[in-house]
Regions:
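C-terminal hydrophobic helical "lid"/dimerization subdomain
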Residues: 3-15, 268-315
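NAD(P)H dinucleotide-binding glycine-rich loop of Rossmann-like/cofactor-binding domains
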Residues: 61, 98-160
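Glycine-rich phosphate-binding loop and adjacent beta-alpha segment
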Residues: 103, 221-283, 312-315
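Glycine-rich beta-strand-centered segment in the early N-terminal region that forms part
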Residues: 37-54, 62-102
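A short acidic, Gly/Pro-enriched loop at the edge of an enzyme's catalytic core
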Residues: 210-217
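Conserved beta-strand positions in the Rossmann-like core of class I SAM-dependent methyltransferases
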Residues: 80, 181-183, 241
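Mid-domain Rossmann-like dinucleotide-binding core that forms the NAD(H)/NADP(H) cofactor-binding site
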Residues: 2, 131-205
Length: 315
């Protein structure tokens, strides 16, 4: 389907583009920089010229049924074309968002995205910093507020408080007026404190359930043994929410929820506001050019990262 394009002299739709594509299920070694067609627009879609695309640790395992596939589901860029009859987005808008997981992603010069999933990006930060927000920050928002029902004044325990999702959860819970208890270890203990946690438990030194006072909400970002042990620290009527794996069933007086993050324009708008106010700070670990996507995906598997690994597509 055709669309409304940028004004004459500003942009001409190319027939092809560079895109990173996964050609097999063996990880970063099966990534290739290919020349492919620029995607056509469906109803309600916009074409975004990608400036930066963030990547996630396990995402190369997601598209095994539709290879070759373009990875990266977080984009920051500029709208260059909109579908006929589409309202709400204009050519030249700087936007960011979480793209659908069941189609090609943003590790390319252009990506077609349903306009309802895009929002104006935070203009106080760079495109790579904008791209670092959607997946992790939406996961944090939905875990705390949509599934966790966190209210001001409540106590929340965040497992992995300085990690990819945890760093946003710590900042959002603090901004919301909750009492934030975080778990971390090593250098991440100091980072969790700097993010605004009221208390930080060094799990390399103590078991969290031995030292934490009862909490209203546990938000788990990593799964495993800490999640299994979490019901014991919840107050009656407490909530256990995990974005990592199905939580254990605790006493009938608590609720346990596992969720998968969903795109949300409304939530992105609020995240943009918080970033531009300086109340939510995205972290970027490293930036790689599109041609070095293999190195970027190898970096995302390494330990010791602080923040997102991002592909820079256009300056």
């Amino acid at each position: 389907m055709g669309g409304n394009q940028a004004r004459d002299g500003e942009w001409t739709r190319p027939s092809s583009m560079r895109a990173v594509r996964l050609h097999g299920g063996d990880g970063a070694g099966r990534l290739e920089l290919d020349t492919v067609s620029v995607p056509d627009l469906g109803a309600g879609e916009s074409l975004v010229r990608v400036h930066a695309a963030a990547i996630t640790r396990d995402e190369l395992e997601w598209p095994v049924d539709r290879l070759p596939a373009i990875p990266s589901y977080e984009a920051s860029g500029v709208v260059v074309e909109v579908a006929e009859g589409l309202d709400g987005l204009e050519i030249g808008d700087e936007v960011y968002g979480l793209t659908p997981f069941d189609r090609d992603g943003a590790a390319a010069e252009y990506v077609a995205v349903p306009a309802a999933l895009l929002a104006p990006r935070p203009r106080s930060v760079t495109h790579p910093e904008s791209a670092a927000v959607p997946l992790a920050a939406l996961s944090a928002w939905q875990g705390l507020f949509v599934h966790g029902g966190l209210a001001a004044g409540e106590r929340v325990l965040i497992h992995g408080a300085a990690g990819g999702v945890g760093q946003f959860a710590t900042q959002l819970a603090r901004e919301h007026g909750a009492h934030v208890v975080g778990t971390a270890s090593g250098e991440a203990v100091a980072r969790a404190r700097a993010l605004g946690a009221d208390e930080v438990i060094d799990v390399g030194v103590a078991r969290f359930e031995d030292v934490v006072e009862p909490v209203d909400l546990v938000f788990d970002t990593a799964g495993g043994d800490p999640l299994t042990r979490s019901p014991s620290v919840l107050r009656e009527g407490g909530r256990l929410v995990s974005v990592a794996e199905e939580p254990p069933h605790g006493p009938p007086t608590i609720t346990a929820t596992y969720f998968v993050v969903e795109p949300s324009r409304e939530q992105l708008l609020e995240l943009t506001r918080l970033v531009d106010k300086g109340n939510l700070v995205p972290a970027v670990d490293s930036v790689f050019p599109l041609a070095e996507a293999r190195s970027a995906f190898e970096r995302v598997q390494e330990s010791g990262k602080h923040g997102k690994v991002v592909l820079l597509v256009h300056e």
